[in-house]
Amino acid sequence: MTKVGIVGSTGRMGAHLIKNVLEEEGLELAALHVFDELTVDVPDEVLITNSMSEVLKACDVVIDFSAPVATQELCEEALKNPTALVIATTGFTAHQQNLLTEAAKEMPVLYSSNMSAGIALLKQLVEQVSATLKDFDIEIVEQHHRHKVDAPSGTALTLGEFAAKGRGLDLDDVRVSGRDGQIGARTKDEIAVMALRGGDIVGRHTVGFYNDGEFLELNHTATSRETFSKGAIRAAKWLVDQKNGLYSINDCLGI
């Protein structure tokens, strides 16, 4: 049995992860890291703690759906107690992103801004279309529930990175987030990434390629958080057998 820990167990994804780990054959829910009171029932033998180091010591793999500051603490503690890490948190600073890279030298780390198989394939398609339709303008729109705290979403930025990669560009050099006022005409290389917030939208991402006389839009819609939870569990089961290194969900899926 593979022992699994969850960081972010009291958050929006926590209940789904707990339920799915308990149901998954070959996995044992070993530890939960909590900031607040746990609102779901778990077996008595599950360790419930606010100590990141205790979670790491109890597990073969830790799944993290939390916040950047918690992920930073997790990585810092994991450097002392190397454990396979599945990271699905978004909104990292450059320093926090570097911590993931450092941790991956000592343990297997899988980081993806979105754990769904559909988004994994969409990234590949976006890069391919971007490279093929070189004269098309690229605009990305993401929609999420009113409670999401970071914008644009990590998934939208990842899609933007793949779009830029398809044209040999760096997203940081060409990204535009929002437009207002007399800003002038759109530049040739810019990639816009727009964020909409409202209601209970789980997640919707559209990458549009626009030209005179025609346009193509690639769209992915998540209708349940179970998609992300089950994707993270699939990643965890795969990751425990990997060597030290930094992986993505695409590596797990072999695409």
Curated annotation (Swiss-Prot):
Keyword Oxidoreductase: yes
Entries under PROSITE patterns matching the protein: DAPB
Gene Ontology, cellular component aspect: cytosol
Pfam families: DapB_C, DapB_N
Binding positions (NAD(+)): G8, S9, T10, G11, R12, M13, A88, T89, T90, S112, S113, N114, M115
Annotated pathway: Amino-acid biosynthesis; L-lysine biosynthesis via DAP pathway; (S)-tetrahydrodipicolinate from L-aspartate: step 4/4
Active site: H144 (proton donor/acceptor), K148 (proton donor)
Name of the protein this chain belongs to: 4-hydroxy-tetrahydrodipicolinate reductase
Organism from which the protein derives: Sulfurovum sp. (strain NBC37-1)
